UniProtKB/Swiss-Prot annotation:
It comes from Shewanella sp. (strain W3-18-1). NCBIfam families: ATP_synt_epsi, PRK00571.1-4. Keywords: ATP synthesis, Cell inner membrane, Cell membrane, CF(1), Hydrogen ion transport, Ion transport, Membrane, Transport. GO terms for molecular function: ATP binding; proton-transporting ATP synthase activity, rotational mechanism. The gene is atpC. It is found in: Cell inner membrane. Its main location: membrane. HAMAP family: ATP_synth_epsil_bac. Pfam families: ATP-synt_DE, ATP-synt_DE_N. This is ATP synthase epsilon chain. InterPro entries: ATP_F1_dsu/esu_C_sf, ATP_synth_F1_dsu/esu, ATP_synth_F1_dsu/esu_N, ATP_synth_F1_esu_C, ATPsynth_dsu/esu_N. F-type ATPases have 2 components, CF(1) - the catalytic core - and CF(0) - the membrane proton channel. CF(1) has five subunits: alpha(3), beta(3), gamma(1), delta(1), epsilon(1). CF(0) has three main subunits: a, b and c. GO terms for cellular component: plasma membrane; proton-transporting ATP synthase complex. Belongs to the ATPase epsilon chain family.
Length: 142
């Protein structure tokens, strides 16, 4: 018996990074973690910077970094429209570590004109990229 699947498109302004049938999609929405399975109720929500975990039709898993964007769930399809999307092998771990360090230092040296929200967004993006890299490293080590 074939597993139930739904069509998934993950796109950014620059490219379409994933298109195909999936058994499950996990992303971080503004209200928390979301697990989208075939037959999910229609939904439109904002997604936070983080990891998209895709369980493909054949049971294999793929992890993608999303910098934030929108998730739309329809009866037969899922669409993720993200500002920036990257496969794990496209992430520069050292650059992400440096961005995290800069954001933390900026927050520690906050002045009167400090934009806390912007610093938190930059920190969240860097940490999300590092989580994707760490997840891939763990999967390779298995």
């Amino acid at each position: 018996m074939a597993a139930m699947t739904v069509h998934l498109d993950i796109v950014s302004a620059e490219n379409s990074i994933f298109k195909g049938r999936v058994a499950c999609l996990q992303v971080t929405g503004v209200e928390g973690e979301l697990g989208i399975l075939p037959g999910h109720a229609p939904l439109l929500t904002t997604i936070k910077p983080g990891m998209a975990r895709i369980i493909k039709q054949d049971g294999s898993e793929e992890v993608i970094y999303l910098s934030g964007g929108f998730l739309e769930v329809q009866p037969n399809s899922i669409a993720v429209l993200a500002d920036v999307v990257m496969r794990a092998d496209e992430i520069d771990e050292q650059a992400a570590l440096e961005a995290k360090r800069r954001a933390e230092a900026h927050m520690a040296d906050a002045g009167a004109d400090f934009d806390y929200d912007a610093a938190m967004v930059e920190l969240a993006k860097a940490m999300a990229q590092l989580r994707v890299v760490e997840t891939i490293k763990k999967n390779i080590a298995r």
